[in-house]
Every structure is written in C-alpha cells, then in structure tokens.
C-alpha cells in the first residue's frame, strides 16, 4: 500500500511539473562567504538543494556595500554548501566593467596590463590582471619595468595574506594604491586598478567541504 501511495505521489509531482515547472521549486537564500561578511546576496530557485551546488552567482560590490562607487566591480560567487533553505558561497572571481576600464584610458597615455598567477598563504591559486595607465606615453622599456613591478607586488601581497585579507586589500583599494606607488617610481601614473581575478584552484579543504556537503545532501534525500 505504501509503495502504491509513493508511486501515486511521484506521478502527481510529474504531472504538476509538466503543467508548471516552477510549482515544485523552492527559493533558497544565498549568502556571501564569511571572509566577505557573510551578507545576503540573492534568492535563487531550485527544485532540489543538490542542483544549487556549483551554481555561479554574479553581483556587483554595490549590491553588498550600497556604495555607488562600487558599481563597476562585478563579483562572482559559487554555491558550495546548502543547509535547509540557506546556501553559502565561495569567491570565484572579480572583474571591472568594460565601460569603466575604457573610461580610464585617454589619448596620449599608455596602457600597461600585467597578468600573473598568485597563491595566497592559505592555498588559493588565482590569476590576477592589473591595469596601469600612465599620464603620458612611455616607451617599451618603461612598460616592461612597470609590468614587472606590478607582478612582484601582487605576488608578494598574495603570498603574505589569506584569501580574506587579500580580497579586503583589493576591494578597499589598498592593493591598487600600493601598485600605483610601485608604478610611479618608474613613470608618472594616472590610474592603477586590479582589473580581474579568477580563481584557478581552491585549497584542498575547500574542495573537501564542497564534496562532503554534496554527499551529505544526497544521503539526506535518499
């Protein structure tokens, strides 16, 4: 009898989902990681908690801080744990909007882009792109020297910080200020920004947590 009731219930769910795919979905509250304040980011729908894991969410820093100057900063988070109707995330990347980056480059200036892979002291491996703009045109040798200094500063800063400390320096503009100082020792700088960050590899404990949580969710639903 119990098996028959289960079969009927399953058929009813299928029928409902065919009529209205949203009928069986629940809304989950998604939060930023603790090292970014653990603030509420958004509500997202899903039929099952497991289907949220590894989903990427993009917001602006303005959505978190309500500071209008943070509108050009896009943040990407990846859901990696679900507890009931609450989902927690880990940082996945950062990028400045193209319009903002274009606004920094003026006629008669030089653009220097430095891209390097860094590793934080707690094991996060990331690719960081730094954009520097000089006040006037500079030669190839100066560009190379500035690029080298940018890479040295970013690599050193990352190696000395955990992910939370590193992102704090990026989002508060401290790292950009240090890069500006490093660059202007070679040529006058107009602006320096951390243009993009992409997580290439998470620390082992971050990966274990994600897999453990997926397994736990699957076990609970079986």
From Swiss-Prot:
UniProt keyword annotation of Ribonucleoprotein present: yes
GO cellular component: ribonucleoprotein complex; ribosome
One GO MF term: structural constituent of ribosome
One Pfam family of this chain: Ribosomal_S3Ae
Alphabetical GO biological process terms: translation
Gene (name only): rps3ae
Signal peptide: none
Protein name: Small ribosomal subunit protein eS1
Family recorded in the similarity comment: Belongs to the eukaryotic ribosomal protein eS1 family.
Key words of the record: Ribonucleoprotein, Ribosomal protein
Phylogenetic classification of the source organism: Archaea, Thermoproteota, Thermoprotei, Thermoproteales, Thermoproteaceae
């Amino acid at each position: 009898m119990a098996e028959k009731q289960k079969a009927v219930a399953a058929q009813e769910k299928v029928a409902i989902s065919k009529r209205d795919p949203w009928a069986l979905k629940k809304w989950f509250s998604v939060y930023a990681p603790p090292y970014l304040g653990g603030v509420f980011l958004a509500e997202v729908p899903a039929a099952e908690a497991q289907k949220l894991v590894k989903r990427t969410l993009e917001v602006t820093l303005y959505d978190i801080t309500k500071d209008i100057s943070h509108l050009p900063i896009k943040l990407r988070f990846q859901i990696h744990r679900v507890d009931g109707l609450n989902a927690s995330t880990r940082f996945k990347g950062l990028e400045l909007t193209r319009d903002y980056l274009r606004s920094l480059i003026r006629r008669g200036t030089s653009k220097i882009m430095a891209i390097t892979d860094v590793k934080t002291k707690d094991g996060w491996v990331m690719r960081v792109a730094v954009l520097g703009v000089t006040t006037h045109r500079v030669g190839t040798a100066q560009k190379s020297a500035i690029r080298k200094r940018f890479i040295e500063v970013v690599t050193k800063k990352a190696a000395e910080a955990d992910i939370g400390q590193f992102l704090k320096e990026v989002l508060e503009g401290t790292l950009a200020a240090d890069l500006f100082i490093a660059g202007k020792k070679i040529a006058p700088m107009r602006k320096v920004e951390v243009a993009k960050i992409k997580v290439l590899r998470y620390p082992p404990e971050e990966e274990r947590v994600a897999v453990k949580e997926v397994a736990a969710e699957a076990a609970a639903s079986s």
